[in-house]
A protein has these predicted regions:
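A residue-level detector for conformationally permissive "hinge/kink" positions
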Residues: 3, 20, 25, 148, ...
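Glycine-rich, mobile lid/loop segments that gate access to catalytic sites or pores
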Residues: 8-118
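Charged, low-complexity interaction tracts
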Residues: 2-20, 175-176, 183, 189-191
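Glycine-rich anion/phosphate-binding loop at the beta-strand->alpha-helix junction
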Residues: 96-191
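Acidic-glycine-rich active-site phosphate/pyrophosphate-binding loop
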Residues: 1-12, 152-162
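Long, contiguous hydrophobic alpha-helical segments, chiefly transmembrane helices and signal peptides
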Residues: 4, 22, 26-31, 140, ...
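Predominant activation on well-ordered alpha-helical scaffold segments within soluble catalytic domains
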Residues: 2-5, 28-37, 86, 123-130, ...
Length: 191
């Protein structure tokens, strides 16, 4: 927890656990996010998030069904992974230990060209995720996997879709090219 750093900077530690770095602080973000999601829906933009990994248990994208995330308490869109993660968490609790996880956020319907090419780069999205106390890293698209991929593996080649518009065959870039949205789903993960 951030008690140490808050005490060092401000000379104050909220022993009740309700300080600025408390997980309870995120409730305002959740409420505002729910309102923002409803407003964005009116513009044809859909935002949703789910748990894609807990400890070593990750969803299998071939089994992924977004509607399934509402059917388990871990919000995992893969029934099998959700059961494995439940078992893993029970083991962690029995050992009086904890583990990390990954939350994936997807934004669909965002038109191409949102963001800036130099400094803003849709930065507020990643910045907001990094402002959550427990988050240690954020990646877009394939993220750090790009570092161990070849250019031909990681390249999103362009094509013309059935409506005659430019599109990408894959989305390794996570819907962001040069800091701007490219009209593909924006995919952001936080761990």
């Amino acid at each position: 927890h951030a008690d140490f750093t808050f005490d060092q900077k401000y000379g104050f530690r909220d022993y009740r656990g309700g300080g600025r770095s408390s997980g309870r602080e995120t409730i305002g973000r959740v409420a505002a996010g729910a309102v923002a999601a409803k407003l964005l829906e009116r513009l044809g933009v859909r935002v949703f998030a789910y748990t894609s990994a807990i400890g070593p248990v990750s969803i299998d994208r071939s089994r992924m069904e977004i509607s399934k995330m509402w059917e388990n308490r871990l919000y995992m869109p893969d029934d099998i992974a959700a059961k494995e993660a439940e078992s893993y968490l029970e083991d962690m609790m029995a050992r009086r230990d904890s583990c990390g996880g990954v939350v994936e956020c997807v934004i669909e319907g965002l038109p191409a060209g949102v963001g800036e090419p130099v400094f803003d780069k849709l930065m507020r999205l990643w910045q907001s995720m990094m402002s959550i106390g427990a988050v240690k890293g954020v990646e877009i698209g394939d993220g750090f996997e790009a570092a161990v991929s070849t250019g031909s593996q990681n390249n999103d080649s362009f094509c013309i879709d059935s409506a005659g518009h430019p599109a990408k065959r894959t989305n390794h870039s996570g819907g962001v090219l040069g800091g701007m949205s490219d009209s593909s789903p924006v995919v952001i993960r936080a761990a």
